[in-house]
Structure formats: structure tokens, C-alpha cells
Design a protein with these regions (language model features):
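Soluble, acidic/polar mature domains that operate outside membranes
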Residues: 1-324
């Protein structure tokens, strides 16, 4: 009888321990994925007119124009590929795993202290969505936390491997539109290409509505040209991008005092002028044969490969000797 009572007591104790362990696990690991904290995606991206990206040392404020391009406060255009990725993140973001409840506080504090805050606003400056992103210690995964929420989540982006929050840590110059030349043939009114060290290669191509295009040399004398060469040349003026921008005013000022390789001025039919100046890159006294600097109208220094700009900086002989 005593043995049976002891067995019952032991079973009762084990049962109580099991219940306590289960409750502890539930309290530490269970989350309601349908809760407000778990609603991490943006409901209506078409209503977004402004995006604030607040970092530890600075902030980016992006605004949408009527023509669907996005600009920064300095009026520089935002790289459209980055905007596309931002909206992809906040339309496809998924919870990869929940965080144990006993870790919420520590992780939330780290996110609020070191993470990136992204806020989406409509035209009336009302907040549509506000969320923090933060990489894990290995910089391979991403935590997400809604503004004023208690529960952080480990999140993932379908089809993307690794920590996608790195995009929001990039310096502002990396957010600039990298395309410096992009025109359709019918947009062009005038192109001037100055070969600084070989002026006899320089030319001006003038295209006025309803008139035959004119090719001029450095002395402003007209030259006959191949129409095939002209058509081919105008197709070169598309999607010409820098590799990256360098945010160094001292470098800009220094280059502006030296002799360039080329000067390119493009005037479109709306009288907008795109003036670009290209300079050699010198490393330990040697000229880089693959890349050069470019000074843009927006006061930026870019690095661009010669193979991208050489088709634009053709000599006048390209038009006069085409097919010979």
C-alpha cells in the first residue's frame, strides 16, 4: 500500500514538473503571429510618397516626384534599383523564426540602439509603416521590430540569401542614381565632345528639328558625315553609369584644377544641359588604363570605366571615315 502511494506521489510530482516546464517553454517561445507586432509588411506601397531612413549618424529622406522618380533633399535622383529593392523587402518580408521571450528585451534594446529605422509616409506626411531592421552578430540574418512593439522577429526575404538590411547602411552617395548619360535619339539637340589633348578630334553634332544634322569640327567648320555613323552614335548615349561616387570635396576641387581627358556637353530638346568632365586616375604616378574620374553637374566625383565612356568620346573621324 505504501509502495503504491509512493508511486502515485512520484507520478504526481513528475506531472507537475512537466506542466511547469511546458508553461515555461510557452511563455518563452510562444508568439501569436497574427498579433500587431507580427504585421511587418507594407499594406499599400502606391500610397508611399516619402521614406525616412534613420541611421545612427545620419538620415536619408527620399521623396517621390510626379514622374515617379525619387529624389533626396539635395535634389539628386535616387538609384531606382535601390527603391525597387526597398519595396520588395517590405512587400515580401516574412518571419523566419520567433525569438524566445526571455531574449526580447536584450534584442529590442540592441535594435533600438544600433538598428536602422525605416518610416513610410503618405502625401499628407502621415506614417503608413514604421519598422526597425538590424543584422544578427554574424551579419548573416536580419531582425525586425515594429515601432513601439515589444516582440522582435528573425525575418527573411524569399529568394534572397543573407542579411538584406545592409542596403540601409550604405553611405548616401551609394543611393545616388549612377546613370550619367541616358538619352533617346529624338531627345538630343546638341552634343559637344572636346578631346583636350587632341583638339583636332573634337566635334559638335547639332540636331535641330526639321533640319539636316550638322557636324562641326573644333574650328566650327562643317564636315560631311555618314548617316549610318550618326544613327549608330546616337544609340551609344544610353545607360552609361558610374561604378560609384566618391564623396570628397577636396578631390573634386583638385581635379577641377587639372587638365581633363574629355569634356562632354549634351543639350536636349528642352534646353537641359548635361556637362561632364573626365580625368585620368593616377596611382603611384601611373595612369589607370581601365577607369577614370568624372565630374558631374551635381558636384560629384564618379569613377567610370573607359569602355563605358569611350563610345561617347569618339573622334570626329568616326563620322567622316565610317565604313572606310
Amino acid at each position: 500500500m505504501k509502495m503504491r502511494s509512493r508511486k502515485h506521489l512520484a507520478l504526481l510530482v513528475l506531472g507537475l514538473l512537466f506542466i511547469l516546464i511546458t508553461i515555461n517553454l510557452v511563455n518563452n517561445r510562444y508568439t501569436t503571429l497574427s498579433s500587431h507586432d507580427a504585421q511587418l509588411t507594407l499594406n499599400d506601397s502606391s500610397a508611399v510618397c516619402h521614406i525616412l531612413i534613420r541611421r545612427a549618424n545620419d538620415s536619408l529622406f527620399l521623396s517621390r516626384r510626379d514622374n515617379e522618380t525619387w529624389i533626396l533633399p539635395d535634389q539628386r535622383i535616387v538609384n531606382p534599383a535601390y527603391l525597387k529593392f526597398v519595396f520588395r523587402i517590405f512587400s515580401q518580408l516574412k518571419i523566419a523564426s520567433v525569438v524566445p521571450k526571455n531574449q526580447w528585451g536584450a534584442i529590442r534594446d540592441s535594435i533600438l540602439r544600433n538598428g536602422i529605422e525605416i518610416a513610410f509616409y503618405n502625401q499628407q506626411q502621415s506614417i503608413l509603416h514604421n519598422i526597425y531592421l538590424f543584422p544578427d552578430r554574424q551579419n548573416q540574418k536580419t531582425f525586425a521590430l515594429k515601432k513601439s512593439a515589444q516582440e522582435p522577429f528573425m525575418v527573411e526575404l524569399p529568394g534572397y540569401e543573407g542579411n538584406f538590411s545592409g542596403l540601409f547602411y550604405l553611405p548616401v552617395t551609394q543611393w545616388y542614381q549612377p546613370v550619367i548619360i541616358h538619352y533617346n535619339p529624338q531627345q538630343i539637340r546638341e552634343i559637344y565632345v572636346d578631346h583636350v589633348e587632341s583638339p583636332d578630334k573634337s566635334f559638335t553634332l547639332r540636331i535641330l528639328p526639321g533640319q539636316q544634322p550638322i557636324l562641326l569640327d573644333i574650328e566650327n567648320d562643317p564636315h560631311p558625315y555618314s548617316e549610318e555613323a550618326l544613327k549608330a552614335y546616337l544609340t551609344f548615349l544610353r545607360n552609361i553609369s558610374v561604378e560609384k561616387y566618391i564623396d570628397k570635396q577636396a578631390l573634386y576641387d583638385s581635379l577641377a584644377q587639372t587638365n581633363p581627358i574629355y569634356r562632354v556637353r549634351i543639350v536636349d530638346q528642352a534646353d537641359s544641359v548635361n556637362q561632364l568632365t573626365f580625368y585620368p586616375i593616377r596611382i603611384k604616378g601611373k595612369i589607370d588604363k581601365n577607369f577614370c574620374y568624372v565630374l558631374t553637374p551635381k558636384g560629384l566625383v564618379g569613377i567610370i570605366s573607359y569602355y563605358r565612356i569611350d563610345p561617347v568620346a569618339r573622334p570626329i573621324e568616326f563620322f567622316t571615315s565610317f565604313g572606310q
